[in-house]
């Protein structure tokens, strides 16, 4: 049964990769170019996008929306504090434990403000949402690695929205498995850091040779 579960997890990850490729291909139909590492559109596409831009008209904004704006944008303060807190946390703890730190830029992505069909208010909203969701995803991965290091055990009850590491955790009540393999979960994190450092070193050497 264990092999069957691991096979299903691998299949699920393959499907996720296929979905990402499908999303990228569909984005390409809208003229998106990611070859340079940044989202770019050609002149004709940008002109067409600007033609769909809506004017800002606060008088047409529903009053409940206007009343909730202080609550919405006020959340940037606790989100920024969480951003700082988890960054300091992983810098201290992950370094001490010898495991790979989470790359913030992989989770906090701010790019939707470049879209020509968004007006300034919409761009601000997109920056805010991108930052907020990115920080939460960033913090989630940090806490997921912490959970793998200290308590790689599934819950007895179903958990909605569990992180991707959770599926490989030990079953609830598997005392023998915890005693035998809990240290192996830590070693996986340490090996991941060693592999990441080796990859970074190889890339740096390749860039040096190219220069």
Regions found by a protein language model. Name each.
Residues 41-48, 82-88, 104-109:
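Short low-complexity stretches enriched in small and charged residues
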Residues 106, 116-119, 128:
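N-terminal low-complexity, charged segments
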Residues 119-122, 144:
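Residue-level signal for mature regions of secreted extracellular proteins and peptides
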Residues 57-68, 107-110:
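Short, charged/polar, low-complexity loop and linker segments
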Residues 95-113:
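Juxtamembrane inter-helical linkers in multi-pass membrane proteins
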Residues 1-57, 114, 127, 132-133, ...:
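Membrane-proximal intrinsically disordered regions of secretory-pathway and membrane-system proteins
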Residues 62-101:
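A transmembrane-helix-recognition feature enriched in membrane-embedded lipid enzymes
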Residues 77, 122-125:
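Generic detector of short, well-ordered, non-transmembrane alpha-helical segments enriched
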């Amino acid at each position: 049964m264990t092999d069957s579960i691991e096979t299903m997890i691998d299949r699920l990850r393959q499907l996720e990769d296929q979905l990402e490729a499908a999303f990228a291909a569909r984005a390409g139909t809208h003229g998106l170019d990611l070859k340079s590492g940044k989202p770019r559109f050609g002149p004709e596409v940008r002109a067409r996008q600007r033609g769909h831009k809506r004017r800002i008209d606060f008088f047409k904004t529903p009053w409940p929306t206007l009343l909730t704006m202080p609550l919405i944008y006020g959340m940037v303060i606790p989100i920024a504090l969480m951003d700082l807190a988890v960054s300091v946390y992983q810098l201290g703890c992950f370094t001490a434990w010898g495991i790979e730190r989470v790359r913030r830029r992989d989770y906090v992505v701010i790019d939707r403000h470049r879209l020509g069909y968004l007006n300034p208010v919409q761009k601000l909203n997109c920056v805010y949402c991108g930052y907020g969701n990115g920080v939460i995803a960033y913090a989630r991965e940090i806490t997921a690695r912490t959970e793998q290091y200290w308590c790689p055990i599934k819950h007895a009850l179903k958990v909605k929205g569990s992180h991707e590491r959770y599926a490989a955790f030990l079953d609830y009540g598997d005392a023998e498995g915890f005693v035998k393999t809990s240290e192996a979960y830590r070693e996986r994190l340490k090996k991941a850091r060693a592999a990441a450092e080796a990859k970074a070193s190889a890339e740096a050497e390749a860039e040096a040779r190219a220069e």
